[in-house]
Amino acid sequence: MDVTRFTHPIDLRAVSITDPFWQRETELVRREVIPYQWEALNDRIPGAEKSWCMHNFRLAGRIMAQYRQQGAQYTPQAYTYRGYDALPDDPAHPDEDKFYGFVFQDTDFSKWIEAVGYSLIQHPDEALEATADEAIDVVCAAQTPEGYLDTYYIINGMDGVFQNLRDHHELYCLGHLIEGAVSYYQATGKDKLLRAACRFADYVADFFGTADGQCKGYPGHEIAEMALVRLYEVTKDEKYLRLSRFFINERGQEPNYFVEEERRNAEREHRPVRSVNLAYHQAVKPVREQDEAMGHAVRAVYLYSGMADVARMTGDDSLKSACERLWRNIVQEKLYITGGIGATQIGEAFSYAYDLPNDTAYSETCAAIGLAFFARRMLQMSPQREYGDVMELALYNTVLSGMALDGKSFFYVNPLSVVPSACHADSRLQHVKTVRQKWFGCACCPPNIARIVSSIAAYAFTENEDTLLTHLYLGGSIRKTFPTGTLTLSIASDMPWDGHITVTLHADAPVSGMLGFRLPGWCPNPNVTADKPVRVVDGYAYLSGEWHDGETIVLDFPMPVRLNRANNRVREDMRQVAVTRGPVTFCAEQADNGENLHLLRVDVEDFGKDGEGVQVLPDSRFGHRTVKLLVPGFRQQEDAEGALYAPYQSAAESPCQIELIPYYAWCNRGEGEMRVWLNV
């Protein structure tokens, strides 16, 4: 592996987003989502589930203040098990001296501050920065003198620290703290939170490792692996890279740490040993031997992202090969057409090959975000069209579906078929919400959306010394410094609705360098027009040479409306089709088509080979410009009540136009049915 050719995300300061789509999304996060989520973290959203996040930090800070005041006279609390999700007996009158929420509740803050950092990089805001500084003071006051920082154990008793890595998320909290601290440091230059994150990471590095007396465990919920690599990149302290590599290398080794941990805990708690679902934790075998994505989907893709980071930083071919195998397994057998992953609510997990149900789909928002993390890291090592295609699919569909268009309500799961009456009556669908929620007790998804949307430019563009790669077509300006000078790209784009993109180059003097552009897989006949030769490798068009002020590159990506079928191993989608245009997956909604969407079928003949029979119309009903599709079809006549079964005969049906909207925009007009896969 030639690590010198790998790329890294572009500095957000070098990008200004002006296109109508992503500018709206990033501005929504800046103006609405970040302030709203700060209120949620402080339990000030009427009618929403409480976060308890800042409550816990303030309580932990008071405990640490007592510790500092009393010194040797301080008597620490013996560990009291509070459960995985601790709630007050009387929600209206919570105890001020108790931890509430999930064991990982601290991460609500960490993801919020990460989004704040990205936003401040692009839009300095004194008031927001002051709020963030006050929050950081509260969080840092909770840290122990030794560097440990997890409010669950600081409040409930430190003698339980690192005794339940499988379930209690301390290393997950570390990972998100690092990500947030790095983002805020890069935005403001203020290092208070970064120093706190480093102290916690140092505490962990002393505790874990292969030396005598060190713990050979690893995270139950992965993210520390990629966060530690990021901390290494900022601090240049190789200890953090070594720790990440240790966690990855140790996972799944025999004797299995999680099995041994369970035996120890059962003995200490005087209870029978319970079975450990190693697949759920991606710990069935060492990571380099894994070839199937399994278990909790978010944990899995966070692990794979960390593996890709370590492979990139260390030149580890065996780790890169494992990432490639796991990637292929996901995209060939376990990926929804909306870019979602994790088919089953049982364990929020990947299911078996080709098991992709629509109405019971879990497809967690965080899992799609994690898939985008994984894709971007694979692109950094090896620019291949498929990685960019899947990243784009996840971002434009499941990720954005997770947040309402006003930024104030959210989906945790993202099914591809919803019938509200069924969801309300069927306990098998209890995980499916028919409208977005103001907040969640387990609120991993809302701040996750905020942090990826506010850093979208880092997914669109990566670079190394002499190359700039464009993976997503965001309109705006991008400044790239090559060894011979600085080149600014002005990109005129109306993606995802129009595939005509013009890149105009600006430079004070001639600049030499390479530019690469992804040729999307959804476009059958991409065209690149420029004054330089175009070389296509792995679905990327490369142009290199000396660039002059005013040169243009025109990319034309025709966007036919496509009728898609699933592999016939996907039983749930037999004799059904899904409609896509460009990177956007479309769906039918009750608001446009009435009830009983299962009675609709697409007229495949009139649809046309390239969607000639489909009307593509502008649509401004959702507060910003989108398109809607009018698809030729039929509606079957609804049977009368009475006989449940009858002799077969062709059903009576009448022609109709099926109106489709972008999947991400569904359920912004009230509760109603929705369906992605339509009958034929």
Question: Could you tell me what each predicted segment is?
Answer:
Residues 3-6, 67-70, 93-109, 160-173, ...:
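Solvent-exposed loop and edge beta-strand segments that line ligand/cofactor-binding
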Residues 14, 244, 323, 389-397, ...:
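C-terminal beta-rich recognition modules with glycine/proline-rich loops and embedded aromatic residues
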Residues 156-234:
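A conserved hydrophobic secondary-structure block that centers on an alpha-helix together
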Residues 510-530:
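Beta-strand-rich binding/interaction modules
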Residues 523-544, 562-569:
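Solvent-exposed beta-strand/loop surfaces of large extracellular or lumenal domains
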